[in-house]
Amino acid sequence: MINTMIDESDKSLFRSTVDFQKPLDKDSHKKQNPRKMSSIAPFENYSFLYEANITGSEVITHFKDGLSPKVLKKMKQGNIGSTPSIDLHGYKIEQACQSVSDFIHFHSDKRFIQIIHGKGYHSDNGLSIMKSQVVHYLKQHPNVLAFCSCPQDMGGTGAVFVHLKTDV
């Protein structure tokens, strides 16, 4: 049986240790700012593409006018730092679009994200429906400034880096 009684010498030692301590002022510590959510509603007005038109090995590049070529070069080289990513393997088209919409909305304070769509190796005709839909969706999204296939060691043609218009 464990003795739960505290003897006087232990009490005295404890008191002598904490006696000179002052309680923390509740307002003096730094408060963390909660994650700023986008004031813009998630993009929901997109169309679906039900026929694949892009092969799994095709390199993708798309950018809006006015984007600096340096930014696109950095994206193609993977020199954009750590990026949040979403993996769409196993998703149906509708689920994937909704998930990408939510993902972009949640990460609207980031400049870059990564979307892993796969290469469509299990497709009947060698065309990737998921990759085609992701490209179709990103071209419609108003907050997407550019996207391109990732470097080979970061997903290659089975993933894209996306440059977002930040609202922060």
Regions of interest found by a model, annotated:
Residues M1-F112, I116-V168:
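Long, charged, low-complexity intrinsically disordered regions
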